[in-house]
A protein has these predicted regions:
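Acetyl-CoA-dependent GNAT
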Residues: 14, 28, 40-99, 110-111, ...
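Conserved catalytic-core motifs of GNAT/GCN5-like acyltransferases
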Residues: 125-130, 142-162
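Terminal substrate-recognition subdomain of acyl/acetyltransferases
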Residues: 1-3, 160-174
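Conserved GNAT acetyl-CoA-binding A-motif
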Residues: 110, 117-129
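A short beta-loop-alpha structural element at the N-terminal edge
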Residues: 8-22, 172
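A short, aromatic/hydrophobic, helix- or strand-capping loop or linear motif
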Residues: 32-39
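Conserved active-site alpha-helix within GNAT-family acetyltransferase domains
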Residues: 103, 107-108, 119, 132-150
Length: 174
């Protein structure tokens, strides 16, 4: 995809905070597949800048941006704990603007995350939670080697309060 439409993948830096917040606000309007609360969406850019600085300097955290024509159209993150006993586990999250769904961007970003994790040699488990009804995402994760470990009944809710089942999925790095 990157050759076809000129997508740039790069790590986020503190100066990206405002654009990331705009993009995440748009994604939150477009889909109920993500679980974002008001606090995350109303985060002051300065606070996110500090968080982005920490992530950028960290060896076991990553925020990858997909940029097209100067606009952030997707993010892929890996968040790991600083505590030694959990520092080998990275929680994966991917968000893509709806206009760019189905174009291979999720695959591209997930390949980059897995490659980064293997190269860093610090993370030995990637994990994520995904709504069972998000078939497109489940297909992507399975295609990339993630395994379903559990079904969490009532693991999430819709805006109308309907309970949703959620998969716990993982990818083990040898």
């Amino acid at each position: 995809m990157s050759e076809e439409v000129g997508i740039i993948l790069r790590e986020a830096v503190p100066g990206d905070a405002k654009d990331i917040l705009l993009m995440m606000g748009q994604v939150n309007k477009e889909t109920e597949f993500l679980v974002l609360d008001e606090a995350e969406l109303l985060l002051p850019p300065e606070t996110l800048e500090e968080e982005l600085d920490y992530i950028y300097e960290s060896n076991n955290n990553l925020l990858l941006l997909a940029i097209y024509e100067g606009t952030i159209i997707g993010t892929a993150s890996v968040k790991a704990d600083s505590q030694f006993r959990l520092s080998h586990v990275g929680e994966v999250g991917i968000s893509i603007l709806q206009e760019y769904w189905g174009m291979g961007l999720g695959t591209l970003m997930l390949e980059e995350i897995i490659s980064w994790a293997k190269e860093m040699g610090i993370l030995f488990r990637l994990e994520l939670d995904v709504q069972v009804r998000n078939e497109r995402a489940v297909h992507l994760y399975r295609k990339m080697g993630f395994q379903i470990e559990a079904v969490m009944p009532r693991g999430a809710r819709t805006d109308l309060g309907e309970f949703l089942d959620v998969y716990k999925m993982s990818y083990l790095i040898e």
